[in-house]
């Protein structure tokens, strides 16, 4: 099957697929998942590794060139290594990446590298061990830091570290940015995006009387614009005698830079990026679709519009799978409508 470029209704090249391989996780982050996890699904409700790989093979013929594996936590899935191998064997796929909390990277990094994984994104919202424990419920800061070190040691390139900034929650952005001084990582600050539907966030709360730890109480005022973040980081740098962030030449941006805009401290080993999903949304350049663990294609993270390919895959009806895919691409919205919200937990979407 020869590959070609597929455009959506607004002329965007659809070349990037994010796949939630599981909705399970070894953490219980307050903005992502209820404290007791998501309701377990019957095995036959979820796509098998073989079905996922076959779907990727089909849409690679429609122009997909980059694949990101997400969850939940993709590394808790026993099928993650063979799945990466199968996707790596698809000639049109140029890049395979994975988003993780990092806790299992020290154990799995060698196998992931051998299977053909190119790069990783690691989630890290704070350097305060106590706050880290409250945000993740089950995680420890040293686990994620060890995961970052393992990713660097095993030569994944680039290693990106993602921090979602919520005004009333995590305040140590300056310290996080300084991790790039001696580590060749790309620390990206992501503006908090209020999804609008409190059904999910109210089930994630740690303490209904502690607003900072209750996502149901977060609102648009908790979004910290990238310009404000950069000013806070520069103020923190000045306080310890460092120079201000300088803009990075676009040609020096890390692979898969996507919507992030990158800066760096003078002489630093890494970079600092800003993803301005709210203050300067990047929908006009969005080239991605998502596949959920139960076999639904989502054209947009912030819409509940889904197109199920599971039954067609199981019937072996490749033409029907492609017809559903093309329909999903054709209905990708021009821009997100965050106010509409979503009926799924973030761990089920693979956001």
PLM segments and residue spans:
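Canonical Radical SAM [4Fe-4S] cluster-binding loop centered on the CxxxCxxC motif
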Residues: 10-49
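Conserved G/P- and acidic residue-centered "switch" motifs that form tight phosphate/ATP-binding loops
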Residues: 73
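Radical SAM enzyme [4Fe-4S]-AdoMet core and its adjacent flexible, acidic
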Residues: 130-133, 138-145, 149, 153-271
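Conserved, mostly hydrophobic/aromatic
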Residues: 21, 25, 29, 69, ...
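Conserved beta-strand segments that form the floor/walls of ligand-binding pockets within enzyme
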Residues: 16, 20, 68, 99, ...
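Radical SAM/AdoMet-radical enzyme domain recognition
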Residues: 46-69, 77-190
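N-terminal [4Fe-4S]-dependent radical SAM core
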Residues: 1-18, 28-30, 61, 260-271, ...
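Flexible mid-to-C-terminal extensions adjoining Fe-S/redox cofactors in radical SAM and related proteins
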Residues: 274, 278-351
